[in-house]
């Protein structure tokens, strides 16, 4: 049925209800059967299917279904654009109220015009007003060229709204199709981006790049999910398809509060904090041997269940949401199996972003430390490791949520500070007996301090080994730091979960104020 702008109204209520049903059928059909079939043939759900699958059954309440564009140029006066290419409204996820929007690629390629952007922004404003999370499925060819500057203005309003919501309600972007040009800045301004393997996101596409720079690149290589996860770090989760993306969004939301005035999520506690002796066997005493820190995480969180964030990016650092005794926490952990757990530019950015989010939404932070230092190298220095490393220092210093730090093994120099030691505001600091808390490793320190003795010795190698052991025993232990109050307790690894749970309970009522200011100057 074609859209009818001059509908002759029926003379009875029953007739008008029938007309309403017909009008709604046109709107819900989107771009029509042929375009819906094409969407399905590409392994993609339609805009309404995505919302219905994401939200609790029968909970979606659409708003603005009858909204229309007001453009008359370039044949737009005759164009049928149901819901102006975006479905907006409210519903619930696992019983929790949310606001959501979903671009409809079957309607003019999901292109964003004035009315579409207005609908999205109004939905975001309602999320802000009610203190509810906002979720948005992006699937659009970009700006609606027929509307000219009005479409550009619409993007600007969306960006402004993204920033207004930032730190107040969680924003989750799901890239489920093309997201090109200026449109890609909106998801970049949200808290989390979930991207399906069939989606693409870039400022300029392969054809433009080819014409300007001569570079040959495919859409997947340039802006596919794997590229954005492993190389650019623009996204937080990769999903196989729409179904998987919706499941990730639900799990992610389960760890988050509704807004910044609520405490961290607390559900389904696992009260078992009995010693887990398996933790004693994961971390080798020999600092040159690697291990997977995720094995440690699995032993200290409820049910061994956690949601890793940016799992494929800066893999020398692990960031994840989990629960300890039912309480939602954010975990930041060095990964010794990759680059020995060194902090580099990408890991610093990854950690700082995660810490900022957790602090914004009252989620306690747990640090698992095994870090030998910042990654040395000319490219790291030229790339701005000083500035990027400072982001971690800034984020942890600014954070006022409970901060619990556990030193598993190495904790050397400035990299230890960047992982939130006592001086950067850690509320509780624990160390395993394997911890080496020092300004630098024993080998490097011995080479500096005892350089003359080693050089003058009859057997320099034997003297070096002796001095390394001497320094190791004197300084690279947890007990010197404990004696100076830098560590609260040296603990049996088996007791780690109990110690963290106890500290989280103690600091659940933590309140900390800082000097009044408009905002700090975050090192960008």
From Swiss-Prot:
Pfam families from the entry?
A: Carboxyl_trans
Q: Which GO terms describe its molecular function?
A: acetyl-CoA carboxylase activity; methylmalonyl-CoA carboxytransferase activity; propionyl-CoA carboxylase activity
Instruction: Give the multimer and partner information.
Output: Homohexamer. Transcarboxylase is composed of three subunits: 1.3S, 5S, and 12S. The core of the enzyme is composed of six 12S subunits. On each side of the core there are three pairs of 5S subunits. Each 5S dimer is attached to the core by two 1.3S subunits. Thus the total number of chains is 30 (6 + 12 + 12).
- Residues forming the CoA carboxyltransferase C-terminal domain are 274-506
Q: What is this protein called?
A: Methylmalonyl-CoA carboxyltransferase 12S subunit
Region Carboxyltransferase: which residues? 13-506
Function, in words: The 12S subunit specifically catalyzes the transfer of the carboxyl group of methylmalonyl CoA to the biotin of the 1.3S subunit forming propanoyl-CoA and carboxylated 1.3S-biotin.
Report keywords, A-Z.
Answer: Transferase
EC class = transferase
UniProt record, GO biological process: fatty acid biosynthetic process
Instruction: Give the CoA carboxyltransferase N-terminal domain ranges.
Output: 13-268
Species per Swiss-Prot/TrEMBL record: Propionibacterium freudenreichii subsp. shermanii
Q: Which SUPFAM superfamilies match?
A: ClpP/crotonase (SSF52096)
Which reaction equation describes what this protein catalyses?
Answer: (S)-methylmalonyl-CoA + pyruvate = propanoyl-CoA + oxaloacetate
Domain of life the protein comes from: Bacteria
PROSITE patterns in the record, alphabetically? COA_CT_CTER, COA_CT_NTER
